Amino acid sequence: MPDDYAKYEKDCEKIREENAKLLADFSDWLTAKGLSEKTVGNHCSNMDFFLNRFLLYEDAKPAETGVFEVGSFLGYWFIQKAMWASRSSIKSYAATLKKFYTFMHEKGRITQEDLDDLKAEIKEEMPEWLATLDRHDDPDITDLNDVWDY
């Protein structure tokens, strides 16, 4: 077990280094698109949390694999783990994820099909993610089985 954890930590460190480069390039890409410094900062902060907290939470997953993890992030993990989870923050993260994976597509790191699937999933699932958040935050719901729509 200690060897497995040491390997996980080593893999995570390598991914964090790659993520730092990606985030710097993403920041430059957003700036070139004409976004304000504040907006660029918000998008980069959102992606830092997604890449370096969520994707590395249980396994060492590189940024490219995150395109397949948006539903579990916005529909469950973010609601559970982020104290600041709100309707507006879920929408903000969704916008950031679309921008980041558009950037990743332009860099040739994900396919057009994967990008299209991500955008479709966000559009289709957003109402359910927001409803899940509302149930999670409802003080009258005491049984967590009533929160998550499995």
Task: For the regions a language model picked out, list residue spans one by one.
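Charge-rich, intrinsically disordered N-terminal extensions
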Residues: 1-110, 116-150
